[in-house]
Amino acid sequence: MPDPILLTPGPLTTSATTRHAMQHDWGSWDAAFNQLTASVCADLVAIARGGDEYVCVPMQGSGTFSVEAALGTLVPRDGVVLVPDNGAYCARILKILGRLGVEAIALPFGEDAAVDPAAVEAAFAREPRITHVALVHLETSAGILNPLDAIAAMCRQHGRRLIVDAMSSFGALPIALADSGIDALVSASGKCLEGVPGMGFAIVRRDALDACEGNSPSLALDLQDQHAYLRKTGQWRFTPPTHVIAALRAALDQYLAEGGQPARGARYAENCRTLVESMRALGFAPFLDASVQAPVIVTFHAPDHPAYDFRRFYDAVRDAGFILYPGKLTKVETFRVGCIGAIDAGDIRRAVAAIAQALESLGIAMQRVSADA
């Protein structure tokens, strides 16, 4: 029986080539593996258009490990971090800062509203103590895209440091770090690069990283120490996820062969268009306005029907070969469908057909939703 297609924001469906890359064992101190790490890091900086200003620091674990590593390493203990908050992953950053004992100021927005750069600027005026901004580029709770370039410009203008969680955007959406003023951009292997989960990374400005020696309260999550050791020896400080890195190397080779960010972004955008149009035809209304919808994951309102139960709906779709994602909003019942991974518009159409069959099996009839809804 074939594996189900994962319509999630990660882990996601990977290619056979990427999975095959994990069939070989690597010595973590061997020169060939060191070269593998170096080549992956070089490509990640190039994808971020970082130039010589930036270095890539890989880190074991999920993306959240690298987010915490970046915050713990780059923000001094007496720093004050502004966190624009429009979803669960923004809230996670606030929780991390709380555990680190760093003062954080939440700037709340609605779950369906992008971060407003003018509100960020107003917060700088109200709170001159703010030293850093921690921004989630693509808040996957709803799939909302926040205006990174405008906020980066605002931070440059006002002399604030910017750390970006680009977990679900890096590789699919255009990002140019050079001359941006961004201190660090964080992402992970198992998202839009279509690798497998297990490695995060921070692409960090060299001068910002070099100034942080001894700042991290953690040994394992010290980006500066990790980078210094890699630079000196070519090796990771502690056991690396060798198979994950080999899979990411294979995934990056496919990414570059596909055409890099423009081609990956175009495929995901077509997946997203196909998904939204097909789901509207079934009667599902997207939660977000199209102007702020990122082509990575789409949140839909759950059916307003007494027979609807997410678990039964999920199981019916899974039995047809597709894995959906539960909603993560606080005020309305929703579910989410991912557009990313080694999938195309044909897979999306088959998934929507499976959703239609699931509705029929549950006895749920819905009316087509217009594009204006």
Swiss-Prot record:
Gene3D superfamilies linked to this entry: Aspartate Aminotransferase, domain 1, Type I PLP-dependent aspartate aminotransferase-like (Major domain)
Modified residues (N6-(pyridoxal phosphate)lysine): 191
Keywords annotated in UniProt: Aminotransferase, Pyridoxal phosphate, Pyruvate, Transferase
Gene Ontology terms describing biological process: organic phosphonate catabolic process
Required co-factors: pyridoxal 5'-phosphate
Pfam families recorded: Aminotran_5
UniProt KW Nucleus keyword: no
EC number, as in UniProt: 2.6.1.37
Keyword Transferase among record annotations: yes
EC category: transferase
Catalytic activity as recorded in UniProt: (2-aminoethyl)phosphonate + pyruvate = phosphonoacetaldehyde + L-alanine
One Gene Ontology MF term: 2-aminoethylphosphonate-pyruvate transaminase activity
Function: Involved in phosphonate degradation.
Quaternary structure and partners: Homodimer.
HAMAP family: PhnW_aminotrans_5 (MF_01376)
Family of the protein in this entry: Belongs to the class-V pyridoxal-phosphate-dependent aminotransferase family. PhnW subfamily.
Protein name: 2-aminoethylphosphonate--pyruvate transaminase
Species assigned in the record: Burkholderia ambifaria (strain MC40-6)
